[in-house]
Amino acid sequence: MAYVVVGASAAGINGARTLREYNKDAEIILISKDEHVYSRCILHHYLDGRRTVEDLDFTPREFFDKYNIKWIKGKEVTKIKPEEHSVTLDDGQEIKYEKILLATGAYSFIPPIENLREANNVVGLRDLEDAL
């Protein structure tokens, strides 16, 4: 069995780990446009200096080795072809799968409060790039 997991946030990481627990022999490939695993919930700690990028990581140090998960980082899935059981990455690479887990997360939302969206000191944090 070959699994592809798209997204390396909490859902993707835990999904990949759970897949491994259910299938010890499967090939599991986790694909993320991010270069780091990090908790989006505490990005504000990076902004105020309480944590470094490395300190935002919520996985054990040897996570990918321990669970035998191949991590393709810094690559974005640009196309999913369900009928062919494949994904295409932004560099043109095609990866085949038998099952896919989409764990791409959400997006930041600024509520429709008067003048809030126009304010220059309001920022929606979604990913590490927003905090840099």
Residue ranges and their predicted role:
Residues M1-V4, D65-L132:
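FAD-binding core/adjacent interface of flavoenzyme oxidoreductases
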Residues A2-K70:
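Beta1-alpha1 glycine-rich phosphate/pyrophosphate-binding loop at the start
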